[in-house]
C-alpha cells in the first residue's frame, strides 16, 4: 500500500494550492481528484465564464462579428483553453513531486483513504487528510433541474449552443457575470 504524509481530496484551486504548499514544505503529497485537475473552478465555473467574456469583449478575437457570434467556435476556444490550463496545473503538481490519483477518494479513517477509480479500488495510507472537494449547485425544491430547460451552473458550458432567452436566478458575482455573457450573445438576459 502506498503511503503519504498528506492526501488532498479535490484538485480544484484550493486542493491544488494546499498540495503545492505541502510539497514545498517537504511533505510527500498525493492529490485525489474525482474528475479533472482544476475542479469546478476551471471546468465549470468562473474560468470558462471569464475566458468567454474576454473573447466576446475583445473585438480582435474574431468571435463577435457585428453582433453575430459563432457560438460553436467560441465554445471550442473556451474548451481548448480550459484543457491547457488543466494540463498546466497537472504539470506544476508533477514538478512539485505531487502524486496524482484520478478517482473518488473516501476517507475510511483519519489515516486511510480508499480511491474508487473506473477500473479498480485501492487504499492509500496517510498521516493527514485535507478535504478540498468544493461544492455542487442545489436546485430549488419547488423547481427541480430539468436539464433541457432549468440548468445548474455546473452545466452552463456543457451545452455548446446559445438559448434564445435566459432567466438567471441568483445575483452573486457568478450570476451577474453569466448575465453579461448571455447579454453579449443574445442581446437579453433576465
Where are these regions (language model features)?
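Conserved acidic residues
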Residues: 12, 104-106, 172
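Glycine-rich flavin
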Residues: 20-27, 32-164
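Short secondary-structure boundary/capping elements
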Residues: 148, 173-174
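Conserved small/polar residues in nucleotide/adenosyl-binding loops
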Residues: 189-190
Amino acid at each position: 500500500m502506498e503511503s503519504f504524509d498528506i492526501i488532498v481530496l479535490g484538485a480544484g484551486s484550493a486542493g491544488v494550492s494546499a498540495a503545492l504548499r505541502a510539497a514545498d514544505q517537504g511533505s510527500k503529497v498525493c492529490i485525489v481528484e474525482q474528475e479533472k485537475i482544476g475542479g469546478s473552478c476551471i471546468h465549470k465555473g468562473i474560468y470558462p465564464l471569464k475566458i468567454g467574456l474576454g473573447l466576446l469583449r475583445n473585438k480582435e478575437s474574431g468571435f463577435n462579428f457585428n453582433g453575430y457570434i459563432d457560438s460553436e467556435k467560441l465554445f471550442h476556444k473556451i474548451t481548448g483553453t480550459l484543457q491547457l490550463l488543466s494540463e498546466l496545473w497537472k504539470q506544476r503538481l508533477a514538478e512539485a513531486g505531487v502524486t496524482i490519483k484520478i478517482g473518488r477518494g473516501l476517507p475510511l479513517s483519519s489515516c486511510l483513504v480508499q480511491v474508487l477509480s473506473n477500473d479498480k479500488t485501492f487504499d492509500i495510507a496517510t498521516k493527514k487528510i485535507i478535504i478540498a472537494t468544493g461544492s455542487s449547485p442545489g436546485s430549488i425544491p419547488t423547481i427541480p433541474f430539468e436539464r433541457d430547460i432549468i440548468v445548474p451552473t455546473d452545466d452552463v458550458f456543457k451545452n455548446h449552443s446559445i438559448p434564445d432567452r435566459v432567466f438567471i436566478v441568483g445575483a452573486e458575482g457568478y450570476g451577474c457575470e453569466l448575465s453579461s455573457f448571455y447579454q453579449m450573445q443574445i442581446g437579453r438576459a433576465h
